[in-house]
């Protein structure tokens, strides 16, 4: 008799929004490049499904922790037209949860480096390795991309499968955090830190030590960016977020100054003027945009940039942004866009930083939830009631 498990499943009817023409891949695979364009009457419910069996090149992971991402909150409810609010790649139905850790419970016959009992994390972006983008090393732009927790069953479940090539060992975190349980809870937060690393360093090029930086948004990715930029030698780290709890977390991980942007906007004041005052006229060597509302932030970001400064766009939105290129050109500025976290040694680098105590995502792990309470965890994240929330399906 096949073993069953509990899982949080997102569903929806494949019904392209009126006026939207699906691509060939969307029609063929019944997937969506933007879920909000295709999936109608979305659902999110705890179900029972069979425990998956690993293929020859896969591992079966007993999930230790599944961290709640802002993307997951978009699977709650629907928009005014009863379409999914998730503006990203997905194929429904699918078990969501893409930030995770666990202990290997079984391995496929062709798995070479990993074994049962290893503690691992895995990249979300399940790249093919064969398309032109992958052959260039551009794994986050894979033309045949699958994504764990969006188009392949994810981690709000007792078990999941992942290809060995996507996995990295984190056994060393047990020594850092004192127990396997705590190590796996914190390890589930490696993915958002890897996303921040990709945006700040791989795509954004980093900063010279002594440069000032600004971070819009003190959610988990913004907090990760602050942690990484402090480690890399930023002087002033100025963080904007209306949430007082998240402002406090930002200061704990390295922000030197935190502000509620709406307090200034409501008074008709520009954030760029504030940044220039705090930096004594120098401006920001880098501005990290880590919200879902760049339309409000980017015009300010352009004005607060120092000469040859960089905007690192990590937050994702389907909305348009007004940008006047001439202002960027006069400053010799750069605007880099980032998505995902695969390749370039990003995950091993992040793991080593945590093992060395240079960054600690555990500082903003606010609460753990049982799998049965996973929707409650996602709702808490939607309300920004803390830093990071982690679902622990097996304890």
What are the roles of these predicted feature ranges?
Residues 50-67, 81-132, 173-174:
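Glycine-rich beta-strand-centered segment in the early N-terminal region that forms part
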């Amino acid at each position: 008799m096949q073993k069953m498990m509990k899982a949080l499943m997102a569903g929806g009817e494949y019904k392209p929004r009126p006026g939207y023409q699906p691509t060939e891949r969307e029609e063929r695979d019944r997937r969506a490049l933007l879920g909000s364009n295709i999936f109608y009457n979305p659902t999110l419910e705890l179900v029972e499904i069979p425990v998956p069996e690993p293929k020859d090149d896969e591992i079966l992971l007993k999930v230790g922790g599944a961290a709640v991402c802002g993307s997951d909150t978009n699977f709650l409810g629907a928009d005014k037209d009863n379409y999914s609010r998730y503006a990203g790649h997905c194929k429904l139905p699918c078990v969501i949860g893409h930030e995770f850790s666990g202990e290997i419970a079984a391995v496929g016959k062709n798995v070479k480096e990993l074994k049962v009992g290893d503690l691992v994390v895995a990249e979300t972006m399940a790249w093919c390795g064969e398309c032109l983008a992958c052959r260039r090393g551009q794994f986050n732009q894979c033309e045949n991309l699958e994504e764990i927790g969006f188009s392949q069953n994810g981690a709000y479940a007792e078990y999941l499968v992942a290809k060995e090539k996507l996995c990295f060992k984190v056994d060393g975190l047990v020594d850092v955090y004192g127990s396997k349980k705590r190590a796996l809870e914190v390890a589930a937060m490696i993915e958002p830190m890897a996303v921040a690393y990709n945006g700040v360093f791989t795509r954004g090029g980093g900063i010279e030590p002594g440069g000032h930086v600004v971070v819009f948004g003190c959610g988990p990715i913004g907090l990760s960016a602050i942690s990484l930029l402090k480690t890399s030698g930023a002087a002033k780290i100025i963080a904007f977020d209306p949430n007082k709890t998240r402002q406090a977390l930002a200061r704990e991980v390295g922000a030197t100054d935190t502000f509620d942007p709406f307090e200034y906007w409501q008074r008709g004041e520009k954030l760029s003027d504030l940044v220039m005052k705090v930096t004594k006229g120098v401006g920001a060597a880098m501005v990290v945009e880590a919200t879902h509302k760049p339309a409000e932030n980017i015009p300010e970001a352009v004005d607060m940039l120092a000469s040859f400064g960089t905007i690192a766009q990590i937050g994702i939105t389907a909305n348009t942004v007004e940008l006047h290129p001439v202002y960027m050109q006069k400053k010799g500025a750069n605007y880099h866009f980032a998505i995902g976290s695969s390749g370039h040694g990003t995950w091993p680098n992040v793991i080593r930083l945590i093992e060395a105590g240079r960054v600690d995502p555990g500082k903003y792990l606010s609460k753990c939830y049982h799998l049965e309470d996973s929707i409650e965890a996602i709702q808490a994240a939607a309300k920004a009631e803390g830093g990071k929330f982690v679902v622990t399906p097996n304890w």
